[in-house]
UniProtKB/Swiss-Prot annotation:
A GO MF label: single-stranded DNA binding
UniProt motif Bipartite nuclear localization signal: location: 21-42
The species this protein was found in: Tomato mottle virus (isolate Florida) (ToMoV)
InterPro entries: Gemini_BR1 (IPR001530), GV_A/BR1_coat (IPR000263)
Name of the molecule in the record: Nuclear shuttle protein
Amino acid sequence: MYPLKSKRGFSYSNRRFNSRNIVFNRPVSGKRHDGKRRGGNFVKPNDEPKMLAQRIHENQYGPEFVLAHNSAISTFIPVIHLGQVPKPSRSRSYIKLKRLRFKGTVKIERVQSDLNMDGFMPKVEGVFSMVVVVDRKPHLGPSGCLHTFDELFGARINSHGNLTIVPSLKDRFYIRHVFKRVLSVEKDTLMVDVEGSTTLSNRRYNCWSTFKDLDRESCKGVYDNISKNALLVYYCWMSDTPANASSFVSFDLDYIG
């Protein structure tokens, strides 16, 4: 209440304030809906099949996996064909290698039962080795064969110690896993368990295997069609006494493809 001066004195009057809505013209940043479709980034549907977690099973056994004493063989883990049905298969020209597991047996068998001068049968003492190697740039040489154990590791006698790739081939090959057993056999035969696993990809490193796939006929999983990261397996049996080592090993390769 405020006093107002007049001729008759002071009087009081209520002074009212009416609130007013102040309107500001603000720019509108929303989408315009004028019935017109405007250009933008649209995600095209992917026609390629989804890459799935799968597993390849491979058994390595038979006459070609019988090692005479002081000998070695080389082989590889075959990968699957493109679009092969039923699974396992691969949907692209590359797969992600996750883990390789193996399990099996090795039979050590004496070749001959000759007695020594004391009339006793000598022991069969030796070293059995199985080595998993990654070939970064797979290709066959002029001979059309895989690198031998001696070419890759220097000599078979090196299996008694710490195996390493020869310096001239370190840029192409690297050792992923070594399984080794030092054996002493008094009987004519002995069965040895073989089991292990190795991780090929982890959180810090991914191992991708790629393929050439030039045409439909070449979309295979053989060594000659792999252009990056093939898995090789080397077997070696060293013994001074004549004896054979027969291996039966099953491999399970986990991959995404």
